[in-house]
Design a protein with these regions (language model features):
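Sec/Tat signal peptide C-region and signal peptidase I cleavage site
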Residues: 19-24
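Bacterial N-terminal signal peptides
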Residues: 8-18
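Beta-sandwich strand segments
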Residues: 94-95, 145-154, 276-278, 329-338
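Intrinsically disordered, low-complexity Pro/Gly/Ser/Thr-rich segments with frequent PxxP/GP/PP motifs
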Residues: 91-127, 273-311
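Positively charged n-region of N-terminal signal peptides that target proteins for export
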Residues: 1-7
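Short, surface-exposed ligand- or partner-binding patches at beta-edge/loop junctions that are enriched
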Residues: 123-144, 305-327
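Short acidic, flexible loop segments centered on an aromatic residue
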Residues: 73-93, 138, 257-275
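Low-complexity, acidic Ser/Thr/Pro/Gly-rich terminal tails and inter-domain linkers that flank the onset
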Residues: 25-67, 73, 90, 157-251, ...
Length: 352
């Protein structure tokens, strides 16, 4: 009986796999890159590495590996790009994105964009006449910090933060070179440092209910202020269990004369060994008037993990303002002087 079931399942699996592949071929291709007629980039070609389909119940798992070659057909240098990649848009597992920050692609130049991700597509969707995966342009950022695209993923803000940080760091390195501060320049570029791996920590934002009850403890969130930050963290609190932080809340004050539209709070985690890690930032839409105070809270759970996968225990939490977007669309990011004043730890400075 078991062998018959196994044989039947194997035949069904092979049939579904052939159907999905045949569908992709009959309907044109695996991939369809859809760019508007006035798009600043043009698809020149793509190289598809081994891409596989695995049937899982009523869905297909698409393991995508490909490289798109795009050309800048606009009249301005492109400094960043975000593509939307969708197998179906009904669930979060059927769509993703690829971001290429800190570029400098002149008009007429070509550049590669790698797409490496897994997406889920319903088997019933193979009857559609469209390709199995659709790629569209979400946002292109130009050198003058204007942008093109629907920006459904809020990509413009992300690309602008990357670009402003890159310009800040390039300006600082150029200053070190111009003033002959070669030892400092070598340290910034990690020249002469043997086998030094940066301290990395992963950050996940979980919004679903917890699967099991865990013992939590209250933990204060200590502010790490930048001297000239437009928004200053004042105090905060959270519930902590192991490597998870639930419902963190930080009180902040807008000390500028501009209205704030969103704030990205960065997190520094100290583990039970006394090591500090910069664990990323979470952007929150929050309107704060000039010289006003507000609270930034997260209803979900922040889960921190080591890059090695080893368990960790959170001993201390610190919060800093990673960037601020004002109502007119402009952005504030910390200067190098702000970062130097925030901490004396050289590794933490480098990560900030």
């Amino acid at each position: 009986m078991g062998s018959k079931l196994g044989f039947t399942f194997g035949v069904l699996f092979a049939s579904l796999l052939l159907i999905s592949r045949a569908s992709a071929e009959e309907n044109g291709k695996w991939l369809d890159v859809q760019l508007p007629h006035d798009s600043p980039v043009l698809l020149v070609g793509f190289n598809m590495s081994p891409t596989t389909v695995t049937v899982r119940r009523s869905s297909m798992l698409l393991d995508l590996h490909e490289t798109l070659v795009l050309r800048n057909v606009g009249n301005q240098p492109i400094c960043g790009l975000t593509l939307r990649v969708e197998a179906q848009d009904l669930t979060p597992y059927g769509k993703g994105s690829v971001i290429k920050p800190s570029l400098f692609v002149l008009p007429g130049e070509e550049f590669p964009v790698k797409v490496d991700m897994q997406l889920i597509r319903p088997i019933s969707a193979t009857k559609s006449e469209s390709a199995m995966v659709q790629v569209t342009l979400d946002c292109a950022l130009f050198s003058n910090l204007t942008a093109y695209g629907p920006d459904k993923l809020n990509s413009r803000r992300t690309l602008m933060v990357y670009e402003k940080e890159a310009r800040r760091d390039r300006q600082y390195l150029a200053h070190l070179l111009d003033t002959g501060q070669l030892p400092e320049l070598r340290e910034e570029l990690n020249f002469g440092i043997q086998d030094v791996a940066p301290r990395q920590l992963g950050l996940e934002l979980l919004r679903g209910p917890r699967t099991a009850a865990v013992r939590e403890q209250a933990l204060a969130v200590n502010p790490m202020p930048f001297p000239k930050a437009a928004v200053q963290p004042l105090r905060g609190a959270a519930q902590v269990a192991g490597n998870e932080v639930r419902a963190p809340r930080v009180e902040v004050r807008n000390i500028s004369k501009m209205r704030v539209a969103s704030v990205a709070m960065g997190w520094v985690v100290r583990d039970d060994r006394g090591d500090d890690f910069v664990a990323g930032a979470v952007t929150s839409p929050v309107v704060i008037g000039p010289v006003q105070t507000s609270s930034i809270s997260e209803s979900g759970t922040l889960r921190f993990s080591r890059s090695t996968g080893q368990p960790m225990v959170i001993d201390k939490l610190m919060a800093f303002v990673n960037d601020v977007q004002f109502s007119d669309g402009t952005l504030w990011i910390p200067s190098r002087a702000d970062i130097d004043a925030a901490t004396q730890d050289p590794e933490l400075r480098r990560e900030l």
